[in-house]
Design a protein with these regions (language model features):
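Bacterial N-terminal signal peptides
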Residues: 2-13
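Tandem repeat scaffolds
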Residues: 23-297
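Cleavable N-terminal signal peptides
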Residues: 13, 17-21
Length: 297
């Protein structure tokens, strides 16, 4: 379901509840739904806004399309819970377990998932705008086409995660582990990857313009045909990385290690580099300030 369609469904569900209840009736409705959950019953499309479910064990529960904004789910056990298209805007999920969950199309905007365990979760198409995911475990997670604008994923484990076509503008990945992650066609303009581990990551056709990759490790990473216009790669570890066909206009490469870096088909003519900087790089149809270089063809 598209994000706009999902939001209209959530608003419709909320409006129907409002028309039928008010005041303490809201609290009674939430309390009744919480009791259903704790009794092991499903609660698809339930109204659980503000619910207190700290430490609750909801293994394999059906919470599809639930409206659970600003809920307290700290340390809750939610493994394999169906939360497709659910609305958990602003909820507190610090330390929660959400491993192997189906969270496709979920709305977790502004939620706090500090230290949450979400390995192999399906977050494809999820709304994670401004979410706090620092120190979370998302290894092997599916984040294809997820919206992570302004999200904080600092020191998060995203090893082998799939972020193909994800929206990552101004997201914070500082010191995150993205070893072997897939970010092909991701939109990461202005994102912060400083100190991140991108060893062996796939970033083909990704938009990393104005991104900060200071001191990042992207040994053997694939940046072919990526847009790195104005990006900062100073002090980066780049040995074996592939930048063939990438846009490196205005890139800051100060003190970066370019040994064994594939620069085939790139234009470096506007960068302040000397032949010594490129002596160990792979150059083929590579434009520099001193002419086209073809030593690696």
């Amino acid at each position: 379901m598209a994000l706009s369609a999902f939001l209209s469904v959530s608003v419709g569900l909320f409006a129907s509840v409002v028309s039928a209840t008010s005041g303490t009736e809201f609290e009674e409705l939430v309390d009744e739904n919480v009791r259903r959950l704790k009794a092991g019953k499903g609660c698809a499309r339930c109204y659980l806004t503000g619910a207190m479910l700290r430490g609750a064990i909801l293994h394999k529960a059906n919470l599809r399309q639930v409206v659970m904004r600003n809920a307290d789910l700290r340390w809750a056990y939610l493994n394999e819970v169906d939360l497709r298209e659910a609305d958990l805007t602003g909820s507190d999920l610090r330390g929660a377990w959400l491993e192997k969950n189906n969270l496709s199309g979920i709305n977790l905007s502004r939620a706090d998932l500090d230290g949450a365990s979400m390995s192999e979760a399906d977050l494809s198409g999820a709304n994670l705008k401004s979410v706090y995911l620092s120190h979370a475990i998302l290894s092997g997670a599916d984040l294809r086409k997820a919206y992570l604008g302004d999200a904080d994923l600092s020191m998060t484990d995203l090893s082998s995660a799939n972020l193909t076509m994800a929206y990552l503008r101004k997201a914070n990945f500082s010191d995150a582990n993205l070893d072997g992650a897939i970010l092909n066609y991701a939109l990461a303009r202005g994102a912060n990857f400083s100190g991140a581990n991108l060893n062996g990551a796939e970033l083909r056709h990704a938009d990393l313009s104005s991104a900060d990759l200071t001191k990042a490790n992207f040994r053997n990473a694939n940046f072919s045909d990526a847009n790195l216009n104005g990006a900062i790669l100073s002090y980066a570890l780049m040995r074996g990385a592939n930048f063939s066909g990438a846009n490196l206009n205005g890139v800051d490469l100060r003190h970066a290690d370019l040994a064994d870096v594939n620069l085939t088909g790139t234009d470096l003519s506007g960068l302040e580099l000397s032949p010594d900087h490129l002596v160990a790089a792979v150059l083929c149809r590579t434009l520099t300030r001193w002419g086209e270089q073809n030593s690696g063809c």
